[in-house]
């Protein structure tokens, strides 16, 4: 009996973790018409208030987490520098 209760509680805990996952919001623009981009962040730790560092067409920006997938978080291991990046 105890193992069944444990299994149910474990399943509920896993579902809660999966359903509470947060994402970067979908970017407003799909392309960038500028000749330069500006990275306001390169990793989540560059953002305040538990925001995510999200990749967008015109650079990386901090955004509040979204419940729906659609955006892309910046890879913290990728080569990145904050500020303007010229093509």
UniProtKB/Swiss-Prot annotation:
Tissue: Expressed by the venom gland.
Places the protein is found: Secreted
Protein name: U14-lycotoxin-Ls1c
One Gene Ontology MF term: toxin activity
Signal peptide positions (record): 1-20
Organism from which the protein derives: Lycosa singoriensis
Main localization category: secreted
Key words, A-Z: Antibiotic, Antimicrobial, Disulfide bond, Secreted, Signal, Toxin
GO cellular component: extracellular region
Protein task: Has antibacterial activity.
Residue ranges annotated for the WAP domain, each copy included: 21-66
Keyword Signal: yes
SS bond partners: 24-54, 32-58, 41-53, 42-80, 47-62
The keyword Secreted belongs to this UniProt entry's keyword annotation: yes
């Amino acid at each position: 009996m105890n193992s069944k209760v444990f299994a149910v509680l474990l399943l509920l805990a896993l579902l809660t973790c999966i359903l509470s996952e947060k994402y970067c919001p979908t970017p407003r623009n799909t392309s960038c018409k500028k000749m330069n981009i500006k990275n306001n962040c390169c990793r989540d730790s560059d953002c305040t208030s538990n925001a995510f560092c999200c990749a967008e067409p015109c650079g990386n920006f901090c955004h509040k987490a979204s419940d729906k997938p659609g955006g892309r978080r910046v890879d913290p291991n990728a080569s990145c520098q904050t500020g303007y990046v010229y093509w």
